[in-house]
Amino acid sequence: MSTLSQDTIKSWTDPKGPVALVLKEHLVPVEGEGGVLFPPTYADVGYNIDELSEGTKVVTVDSVGSQANRMEPIFATDPDLQPLVPQVAIDLGEGRQISLLEAGHRLGDAIVRSSSLKDDARSAFESFLDTGDSTSIAKLAPTSLVFGVWDSRDTQAKLSRIVQSVIRAWDVDVLTRS
Protein backbone atom coordinates (compact mmCIF):
# COMPACT_ATOMS: atom_id res chain seq x y z
CA MET A 1 0.00 0.00 0.00
CA SER A 2 1.44 3.39 -0.93
CA THR A 3 1.62 6.39 1.39
CA LEU A 4 -0.36 9.46 0.37
CA SER A 5 1.35 12.84 0.25
CA GLN A 6 -0.12 15.89 1.96
CA ASP A 7 -0.51 17.52 -1.48
CA THR A 8 -2.59 14.58 -2.70
CA ILE A 9 -4.83 14.68 0.36
CA LYS A 10 -5.24 18.48 0.12
CA SER A 11 -6.18 18.18 -3.56
CA TRP A 12 -9.28 16.23 -2.53
CA THR A 13 -10.83 19.44 -1.17
CA ASP A 14 -10.76 21.07 -4.60
CA PRO A 15 -14.33 21.51 -5.92
CA LYS A 16 -13.20 19.69 -9.07
CA GLY A 17 -11.71 16.90 -6.97
CA PRO A 18 -13.16 13.47 -6.28
CA VAL A 19 -16.72 12.96 -5.10
CA ALA A 20 -15.89 9.73 -3.31
CA LEU A 21 -12.89 7.98 -1.86
CA VAL A 22 -12.81 4.20 -1.85
CA LEU A 23 -10.47 2.11 0.26
CA LYS A 24 -10.24 -1.59 -0.44
CA GLU A 25 -8.31 -3.59 2.12
CA HIS A 26 -7.63 -7.32 2.29
CA LEU A 27 -8.84 -8.55 5.69
CA VAL A 28 -8.12 -11.94 7.22
CA PRO A 29 -10.32 -13.81 9.72
CA VAL A 30 -8.97 -14.01 13.29
CA GLU A 31 -8.24 -17.70 12.68
CA GLY A 32 -5.93 -16.73 9.81
CA GLU A 33 -6.05 -17.08 6.03
CA GLY A 34 -8.73 -19.58 5.06
CA GLY A 35 -10.39 -19.39 8.48
CA VAL A 36 -14.15 -19.72 8.76
CA LEU A 37 -16.17 -16.58 9.34
CA PHE A 38 -19.83 -16.52 10.30
CA PRO A 39 -21.35 -13.19 9.20
CA PRO A 40 -24.35 -11.59 10.89
CA THR A 41 -27.79 -12.95 10.12
CA TYR A 42 -30.85 -10.91 9.28
CA ALA A 43 -34.42 -11.81 10.23
CA ASP A 44 -35.80 -11.88 6.69
CA VAL A 45 -32.86 -13.34 4.72
CA GLY A 46 -30.45 -15.04 7.11
CA TYR A 47 -26.98 -14.33 5.75
CA ASN A 48 -27.00 -11.41 3.32
CA ILE A 49 -25.35 -13.16 0.37
CA ASP A 50 -25.58 -11.68 -3.11
CA GLU A 51 -24.60 -13.55 -6.24
CA LEU A 52 -23.00 -11.47 -8.98
CA SER A 53 -23.82 -12.10 -12.64
CA GLU A 54 -20.68 -14.19 -13.17
CA GLY A 55 -21.48 -16.34 -10.11
CA THR A 56 -19.27 -14.81 -7.42
CA LYS A 57 -20.97 -14.85 -4.02
CA VAL A 58 -20.51 -11.76 -1.82
CA VAL A 59 -21.63 -11.64 1.82
CA THR A 60 -22.10 -8.61 4.05
CA VAL A 61 -19.82 -9.01 7.07
CA ASP A 62 -20.56 -5.59 8.57
CA SER A 63 -23.22 -3.18 7.30
CA VAL A 64 -23.11 0.58 6.79
CA GLY A 65 -25.41 1.14 9.78
CA SER A 66 -23.44 -1.17 12.02
CA GLN A 67 -20.18 0.58 11.13
CA ALA A 68 -21.72 4.01 11.85
CA ASN A 69 -23.07 2.79 15.18
CA ARG A 70 -19.51 1.93 16.21
CA MET A 71 -17.77 4.99 14.76
CA GLU A 72 -20.06 7.69 16.13
CA PRO A 73 -19.74 6.96 19.89
CA ILE A 74 -15.95 7.22 19.57
CA PHE A 75 -16.44 10.99 19.41
CA ALA A 76 -17.83 10.79 22.96
CA THR A 77 -15.19 8.49 24.43
CA ASP A 78 -11.88 9.28 22.72
CA PRO A 79 -10.23 12.31 24.40
CA ASP A 80 -8.53 13.29 21.13
CA LEU A 81 -11.81 13.28 19.19
CA GLN A 82 -14.15 14.78 21.81
CA PRO A 83 -13.19 18.40 20.99
CA LEU A 84 -14.17 17.89 17.34
CA VAL A 85 -17.92 17.72 18.00
CA PRO A 86 -20.28 19.28 20.55
CA GLN A 87 -20.73 17.00 23.56
CA VAL A 88 -24.50 17.28 24.01
CA ALA A 89 -25.96 15.38 26.95
CA ILE A 90 -29.72 14.89 27.08
CA ASP A 91 -31.20 14.71 30.57
CA LEU A 92 -33.37 11.61 30.99
CA GLY A 93 -34.40 12.50 34.54
CA GLU A 94 -33.53 10.88 37.84
CA GLY A 95 -29.88 11.82 37.33
CA ARG A 96 -29.55 9.89 34.06
CA GLN A 97 -28.20 11.31 30.81
CA ILE A 98 -27.50 10.08 27.30
CA SER A 99 -25.05 11.58 24.86
CA LEU A 100 -26.56 12.74 21.58
CA LEU A 101 -23.77 10.64 20.03
CA GLU A 102 -25.49 7.55 21.44
CA ALA A 103 -28.98 8.43 20.16
CA GLY A 104 -29.73 6.00 17.34
CA HIS A 105 -31.27 8.57 15.00
CA ARG A 106 -28.95 11.40 15.97
CA LEU A 107 -30.61 14.83 15.90
CA GLY A 108 -33.77 13.19 14.49
CA ASP A 109 -34.12 10.82 17.47
CA ALA A 110 -37.32 10.77 19.53
CA ILE A 111 -35.26 11.44 22.63
CA VAL A 112 -34.34 14.85 21.17
CA ARG A 113 -38.02 15.69 20.61
CA SER A 114 -38.70 15.09 24.29
CA SER A 115 -35.82 17.25 25.49
CA SER A 116 -35.02 20.93 25.83
CA LEU A 117 -33.17 20.59 22.51
CA LYS A 118 -36.38 19.97 20.53
CA ASP A 119 -37.01 23.59 19.45
CA ASP A 120 -33.40 24.10 18.33
CA ALA A 121 -33.47 20.81 16.43
CA ARG A 122 -36.77 21.64 14.74
CA SER A 123 -35.49 25.08 13.76
CA ALA A 124 -32.28 23.56 12.34
CA PHE A 125 -34.22 21.04 10.24
CA GLU A 126 -36.65 23.73 9.01
CA SER A 127 -33.73 25.99 8.07
CA PHE A 128 -32.25 23.15 6.04
CA LEU A 129 -35.57 22.48 4.30
CA ASP A 130 -36.11 26.19 3.56
CA THR A 131 -32.61 27.13 2.40
CA GLY A 132 -30.61 23.94 1.90
CA ASP A 133 -28.15 25.27 4.47
CA SER A 134 -27.18 22.66 7.06
CA THR A 135 -25.08 25.00 9.24
CA SER A 136 -27.56 24.92 12.14
CA ILE A 137 -27.59 21.12 12.09
CA ALA A 138 -23.79 21.10 11.99
CA LYS A 139 -23.62 23.35 15.06
CA LEU A 140 -25.94 21.10 17.07
CA ALA A 141 -24.93 17.66 15.87
CA PRO A 142 -22.27 17.52 13.14
CA THR A 143 -22.29 13.73 13.19
CA SER A 144 -25.86 13.95 11.86
CA LEU A 145 -24.28 15.23 8.64
CA VAL A 146 -21.47 12.68 8.67
CA PHE A 147 -23.63 9.61 9.36
CA GLY A 148 -26.98 10.90 8.04
CA VAL A 149 -30.20 11.88 9.73
CA TRP A 150 -33.92 11.74 9.08
CA ASP A 151 -36.39 13.75 11.13
CA SER A 152 -39.05 11.14 10.40
CA ARG A 153 -41.52 12.18 13.10
CA ASP A 154 -41.60 15.92 12.49
CA THR A 155 -40.21 17.97 9.59
CA GLN A 156 -39.32 14.95 7.39
CA ALA A 157 -35.91 16.54 6.69
CA LYS A 158 -33.54 13.87 5.45
CA LEU A 159 -29.80 14.22 4.94
CA SER A 160 -27.81 11.39 3.40
CA ARG A 161 -24.70 10.19 5.17
CA ILE A 162 -21.40 11.36 3.74
CA VAL A 163 -19.43 8.47 5.25
CA GLN A 164 -20.23 4.92 4.26
CA SER A 165 -18.24 1.99 5.48
CA VAL A 166 -19.08 -1.62 4.80
CA ILE A 167 -17.18 -4.88 5.05
CA ARG A 168 -17.88 -7.60 2.50
CA ALA A 169 -16.36 -11.00 1.90
CA TRP A 170 -15.97 -12.16 -1.69
CA ASP A 171 -16.11 -15.59 -3.28
CA VAL A 172 -17.77 -17.21 -0.28
CA ASP A 173 -19.27 -20.62 0.33
CA VAL A 174 -22.21 -21.12 2.66
CA LEU A 175 -21.26 -23.26 5.64
CA THR A 176 -23.27 -24.40 8.64
CA ARG A 177 -22.08 -25.09 12.17
CA SER A 178 -23.46 -28.63 12.31
Which residues are covered by each model-predicted region?
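An N-terminal structural lobe/cap that precedes and organizes the functional/catalytic core
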Residues: 2-106
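RAMP-family (Cas7-like) RNA-binding scaffold and associated basic/acidic loop-rich RNA-contact surfaces
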Residues: 86-178
